[in-house]
């Protein structure tokens, strides 16, 4: 019997890669905290009806891509395909709207869609997202866009472009939907099969087709910007002006509609040319009707999600993220020395140092080689002699300098040890 493998569309994130993920999470937390966004953690699975009502039954996500099953209570359950619907459900269930004003929330975690796996697209994928609930002000749209660009810039990403569109309100989209159907009907037999199906269910999604012939037909399709009402046009004009005021470059893309039915007014994507076909690294927009659709009060809202897998691909191309290396590597030999080494390691860790304890029990020579490979600044050596006298050997690995110290003194004078470690680290680059 062979070993069990991961399922298609899933992958292990190994220690050699996890530093990139932790780096992204750290930068995101810092930037969003400064803007007063608070983290929220919602369940990974929800009632299926949440996504059917929230995302829209006519979408590809609900119709083709969700992982849905019956649990032992005969409830229809779905692994979340995106984060916004669950956050809105939590916002309502926990009465976060009761205090009035604006709620600024952010989340991170795995999502699930049954898609064809490829670079940057997995069936289990990870997102960082934010939601600003309670404001219909165009400044809210621009705040979330600016935060997304801040995060990506802080991560050192280049070759980024912001695509911007407005999908208007419900009335605007209904007028536009009728215009699209009238435009596409004469081309129906030339459209790809998915677009033919969308013609009746969700014609706006035809604009997002990747099929070459359909893309050619789309070039002359009417623009939704021609069907915006006065209020929608005013909102979109203000968003564009505010982006200009912040020196955030953008380009209008009338074909940008996003894949979820809850979007209203502003829709946007941030893309990178370095990602090939899967160019979008962040996408979002306004969803003023979703809270009411899920049974809550009429509440304007706007948000976005960043695809972590695609972001990590870009980071690997652009920069090296430091991996965790120990400050101190402890080697020991002999029963008493090994017991003291364990105690010493725990004391130093408690004092804030990064310590790796060699547990191999092998000869000192092999342990010293592992200490050199670890990247540690210093090595603590404990043998029978040191164990008997409650001392240790402190060896600076770059200079090979070595000194004998009292074990208790080392811990009690931890500040001096930290200062020495810092000086040696600076001296060795």
Swiss-Prot record:
Disulfide bonds: none annotated. It catalyses: tRNA(His) + L-histidine + ATP = L-histidyl-tRNA(His) + AMP + diphosphate + H(+). The keyword DNA damage does not apply. Pfam families: HGTP_anticodon (PF03129), tRNA-synt_His (PF13393). Its EC number is 6.1.1.21. One of its GO terms (molecular function) is ATP binding. The keyword Ion transport does not apply. Its main location: cytoplasm. GO terms for biological process: histidyl-tRNA aminoacylation. PROSITE patterns: AA_TRNA_LIGASE_II. One of its GO terms (cellular component) is cytoplasm. It is found in: Cytoplasm. Keywords: Aminoacyl-tRNA synthetase, ATP-binding, Cytoplasm, Ligase, Nucleotide-binding, Protein biosynthesis. Belongs to the class-II aminoacyl-tRNA synthetase family. HAMAP family: His_tRNA_synth. Homodimer. This is Histidine--tRNA ligase. It comes from Rippkaea orientalis (strain PCC 8801 / RF-1). The gene is hisS.
């Amino acid at each position: 019997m062979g070993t069990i493998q991961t399922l298609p569309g899933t992958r292990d994130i190994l220690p050699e890669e996890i530093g990139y993920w932790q780096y992204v999470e750290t930068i995101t937390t810092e930037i969003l905290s400064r803007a007063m966004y608070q983290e929220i953690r919602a369940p990974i699975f929800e009632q299926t009806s949440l996504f059917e009502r929230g995302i829209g039954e006519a979408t590809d996500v609900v119709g083709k891509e969700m992982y849905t099953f019956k649990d032992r209570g005969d409830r229809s359950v779905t692994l979340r395909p995106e984060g916004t619907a669950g956050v809105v459900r939590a916002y309502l269930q926990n009465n976060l709207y009761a205090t009035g004003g604006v709620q600024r929330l952010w989340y991170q975690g795995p999502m699930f869609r049954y898609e064809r796996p490829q670079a940057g697209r997995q069936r289990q994928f990870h997102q960082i997202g934010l939601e600003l609930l309670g404001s219909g002000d165009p400044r809210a749209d621009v705040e979330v866009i600016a935060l997304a660009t801040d995060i990506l810039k802080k991560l050192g990403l280049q070759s980024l472009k912001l695509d911007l569109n407005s999908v208007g309100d419900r009335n605007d989209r209904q007028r536009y939907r009728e215009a699209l159907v009238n435009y596409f009907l004469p081309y129906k037999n030339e459209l790809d099969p998915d677009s033919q199906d969308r013609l009746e269910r969700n014609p706006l999604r035809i604009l997002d087709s990747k099929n070459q012939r359909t893309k050619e037909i789309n070039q002359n399709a009417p623009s939704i910007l021609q069907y915006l009402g006065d209020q929608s046009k005013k909102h979109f004009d203000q968003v564009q002006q505010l982006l200009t005021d912040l020196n955030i470059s953008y380009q209008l893309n009338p074909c940008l509609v996003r894949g979820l039915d809850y979007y209203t007014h502003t829709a946007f994507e941030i893309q990178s040319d370095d990602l090939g076909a899967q160019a979008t690294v962040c996408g979002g927009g306004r969803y003023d009707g979703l809270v009411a659709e899920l049974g809550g009060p009429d509440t304007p809202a706007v948000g976005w999600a960043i695809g972590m897998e695609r972001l990590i691909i870009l980071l690997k191309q652009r920069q090296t993220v430091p991996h965790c290396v120990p400050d101190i590597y402890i080697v020991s030999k002999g029963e008493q020395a090994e017991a003291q080494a364990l105690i010493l390691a725990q004391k130093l860790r408690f004092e804030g140092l990064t310590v790796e304890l060699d547990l191999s029990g092998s000869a000192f020579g092999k342990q010293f080689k592992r200490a050199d490979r670890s990247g540690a600044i210093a090595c603590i050596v404990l043998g029978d002699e040191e164990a008997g006298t409650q001392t240790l050997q402190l060896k600076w690995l770059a200079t090979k300098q070595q000194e004998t110290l009292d074990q208790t003194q080392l811990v009690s004078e931890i500040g001096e040890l930290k200062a020495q470690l810092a000086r040696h680290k600076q001296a060795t680059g």
